[in-house]
A protein has these predicted regions:
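Interfacial segments of alpha-helical transmembrane regions
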Residues: 12-19, 90-99, 151-156
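Membrane-interface helix-boundary motifs at transmembrane edges
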Residues: 6-7, 80-93, 142-152
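Interfacial helix-start motif at the membrane-water boundary
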Residues: 50-73
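Membrane-proximal helix-loop-helix units in multi-pass membrane proteins
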Residues: 98-144
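C-terminal TM-helix exit segments that contain a strictly Trp-centered aromatic cap at the helix terminus
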Residues: 25-35, 107-112, 162-168
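N-terminal signal-anchor transmembrane alpha helix
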Residues: 7-37
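Hydrophobic cores of alpha-helical transmembrane segments in multi-pass inner/ER membrane proteins
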Residues: 20, 67-77, 128-137
């Protein structure tokens, strides 16, 4: 790995962490500050994630939607930088589909559930592109069966199958 690839790798890693941090901060602050009409706090059993970003319903909707939007754009930059230093052509479809899934997630954060048709369109395309991305990564893992790292390959294979069940 030369110095250019090392710099791109470091930059991609930092943008990826920044994006994950943005998603996490938005989710934590919005869920801690959430109160519904009955005075109840946030619960995954009673409230959807989209309701955290609904203006007029959630006091910290701006934080949640901003974290979702800017975190997704930061993760898009991570995928673009990873695409430049990718050494295996089997990973190109996975990264490209991940970019499309993250752009759909950014659209979901840009248009809250108050703009219902655009919000649901973003959510729908996110699930489609994320499932296709995971499926293409599964193809990459299956064609890499000769890799020495058997444990990480099997763990990634199990996680891919689990996420296909969830997204599919």
């Amino acid at each position: 790995m030369n110095s250019r690839e090392r710099k791109l790798s470091r930059l991609a890693f930092r943008f990826g962490l920044l994006g994950l941090f943005g998603h996490l901060i938005g989710l934590v602050f919005a869920s801690l500050g959430f109160n519904d009409f009955n005075g109840q706090g946030f619960s995954f059993y009673n409230v959807t994630l989209s309701e955290l970003g609904q203006y007029g319903h959630s006091g910290l909707a701006v934080v949640f939607n901003g974290g979702l939007f800017f975190g997704s754009l930061s993760l898009v930059l991570f995928c673009l930088f990873a695409l430049q230093i990718c050494d295996n052509p089997w990973l190109y479809p996975c990264l490209f589909l991940s970019i499309l899934a993250l752009l759909a997630l950014a659209i979901t954060g840009l248009f809250p559930i108050n703009v219902y048709h655009l919000h649901t369109l973003g959510v729908e395309y996110f699930f489609h592109f994320a499932a296709l991305s995971v499926a293409s990564y599964l193809v990459y893992l299956l064609q890499q069966s000769y890799v020495d790292k058997r444990f990480s390959g099997q763990g990634s294979l199990i996680l891919c199958l689990l996420s296909l069940v969830i997204f599919g």
